[in-house]
Amino acid sequence: MKHKGQKIQSFICHFYLIILTIIAIFPLVWIILSSIKGKGELTGNPTGFLPKTFTLEYFRHVIFDLGFINNIKNSAGIALVTTLIAIIVAALAAYGIVRFFPKFGSVMSKVLVTTYIFPPILLAIPYSIVMAKAGLVNTRIGLIIVYLSFSIPYAVWLLVGFFKSVPIGIEEAARIDGANKIKVFGTVVLPLVAPGIVATAIYTF
């Protein structure tokens, strides 16, 4: 009897999950099917589910006529440059905070992460004023600067945790062997925190 009750409970749970899945994916499926309908069919019967005619004209229009490919290239280029600069700056800052200013670094990390309490829209007007005065409106450099201002604080906060996980003894051993601070950072510390840098780069991108 108990086993039968478990089966009923399992069936109800699976049925409920199936219904939720259908509700979640139905709008996406409807949008995809609508995108391949002919123009007359889409305007004449917008609530129809299955297309009677098939066309890729809308995709061609978006990709070739509206400059979609160029927009993707611009976005990818800006994102790559932003990520590269943010990771370099954040890695140096996080390492300096952990190794040279540990007490100050704990407070600084909290201050950096609290900047995410405020929604980005609050900075829209100040950013617009600053960029307009600097002549950087509608420029790639302006976008990169804005994105860096959002990505660097969180990247520093993330990397501080990874650099803290590196034992100081490893760095001291490298210095005893004759390595300077730059070499220790580049050849000893960075390889150890490489997974954290990759994770931070993915977030920043």
Spans of model-derived segments:
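A structural signal for multi-pass alpha-helical bundles of membrane permease subunits
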Residues: 2-205
